[in-house]
């Protein structure tokens, strides 16, 4: 009888219940909240469902030495996590993004590239704020990139500069990507007048197939020469776009923007979620990172809208820019552009801003990768 009781006690010591703490419960609840919001609100479900479930997986307590934890060498999750730690996954995501992206709006309206560039100021604003809050320059650079609203770029840069903060930075970046409509809309309304919101922009010109093919080649050469350290992201982005636009690599483009990006998104989401273990994630540092991420995102939106208003001072009547597209300078494609469209139609149901907003939006994708390269070249 004693042997049976001892065996039961020994078994119970191996269960998750015996090792459960309130921190584990909090993190599991946060993971479930991510899943709930993704399903009920339809906020970035392709990102939040894997991340949320990964949080649940990563916070089930277990006895050390079982070779199942994400930080235990040789475990399945640890092997999958190598793609995040060593920066393999983000370039593959950029390959898929490139194969999905139509740069026509940017090619036909190159001046809107400046709005995408202006929005990157949020990254450097958060960098300065993080320095003042006690983070090292490398940590501050990794945190600042959250303002680009680009999860893969945030993972890529944090894996190089601050791997110990990668979980908090990645979750913060993806959370704010999901909250784009909630965060940006009030800022856009506060910064624009009714007359500005009613501005109708000229229909962009048609872009030839030749221009679409030349753009990724020239774009990559120029950006890579300026910021060689951003080549892994920029190269895959423009290569993916060339696959899409060349007309002779349809199968490769479909694979890049379909099955491949879906698989990599799942792997990134689950492994990043798993990495947010209670003892690592529930700290004052994580709270600071979330605050700085929000600050960076707000500054990026303000700079994008504000710069569009400044550009209007130099634009002739009839060629004005609707400043509502300024929010789209962040890299959240196409969510930020949809916010521009929705807010614009609230004021004028017949004013379609989506095609215009896509120009600074795709410029923001390029801009965030360039900004990451600049930060990496100085701090890496």
In which residue ranges do the predicted regions lie?
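N-terminal alpha-helical transmembrane segments of multi-pass membrane transport
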Residues: 1-72
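Structural signature of hydrophobic alpha-helical transmembrane segments
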Residues: 16-27, 78-93, 139-147, 174, ...
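Entry/N-cap segments of selected transmembrane alpha helices
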Residues: 32, 106-127, 279-305, 357-361
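Interfacial helix-loop-helix linkers and transmembrane-helix boundary segments
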Residues: 39-48, 67-69, 77-81, 100-115, ...
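Alpha-helical membrane segments and immediately flanking helix-loop junctions
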Residues: 82, 86-87, 94-100, 115-125, ...
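Alpha-helical transmembrane segments
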Residues: 164-182, 290-302, 324-328
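Membrane-embedded hairpin module used as a gating/binding unit in multi-pass transport
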Residues: 175-248
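Transmembrane helical segments that form the transport core of multi-pass membrane transport proteins
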Residues: 220-308
């Amino acid at each position: 009888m004693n042997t049976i009781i001892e065996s039961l006690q020994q078994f119970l010591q191996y269960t998750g219940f015996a090792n459960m703490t309130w921190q584990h419960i909090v993190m599991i609840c946060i993971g479930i909240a991510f899943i709930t919001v993704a399903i009920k609100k339809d906020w970035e479900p392709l990102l939040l469902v894997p991340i949320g479930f990964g949080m649940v997986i990563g916070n089930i307590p277990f006895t050390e030495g079982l070779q199942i934890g994400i930080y235990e060498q040789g475990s399945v999750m640890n092997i999958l996590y190598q793609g995040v730690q060593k920066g393999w996954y983000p370039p593959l995501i950029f390959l898929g993004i490139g194969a999905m992206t139509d740069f026509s709006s940017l090619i036909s309206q190159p001046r809107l590239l400046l709005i995408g560039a202006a929005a990157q100021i949020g990254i450097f604003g958060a960098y300065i704020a993080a320095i003042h809050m006690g983070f090292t320059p490398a940590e501050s650079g990794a945190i600042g990139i959250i303002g680009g609203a680009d999860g893969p770029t945030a993972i890529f840069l944090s894996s190089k500069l601050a791997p110990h903060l990668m979980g908090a930075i990645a979750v913060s970046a993806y959370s704010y990507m999901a909250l784009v409509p909630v965060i940006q809309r009030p800022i856009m309304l506060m910064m624009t007048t009714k007359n500005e919101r009613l501005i109708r922009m000229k229909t962009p010109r048609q872009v030839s197939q030749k221009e679409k093919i030349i753009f990724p080649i020239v774009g990559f050469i120029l950006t890579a020469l300026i910021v060689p350290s951003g080549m892994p992201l920029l190269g895959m982005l423009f290569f993916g776009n060339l696959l899409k636009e060349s007309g002779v690599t349809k199968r490769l483009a479909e694979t890049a923007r379909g099955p491949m990006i879906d698989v990599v998104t799942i792997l990134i989401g689950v492994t990043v979620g798993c990495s947010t273990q209670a003892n690592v994630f529930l700290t004052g540092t994580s709270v600071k990172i979330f605050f700085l991420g929000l600050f960076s995102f707000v500054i990026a939106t303000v700079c994008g809208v504000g710069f569009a208003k400044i550009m209007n001072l130099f634009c002739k009547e009839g060629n004005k820019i609707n400043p509502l597209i300024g929010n789209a300078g962040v890299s959240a494609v196409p969510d930020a552009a949809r916010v521009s469209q929705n807010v614009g139609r609230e004021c004028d149901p017949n004013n379609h801003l989506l095609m215009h907003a896509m120009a600074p939006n795709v410029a923001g994708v390029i801009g965030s990768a360039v900004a990451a390269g600049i930060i990496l070249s100085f701090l890496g």
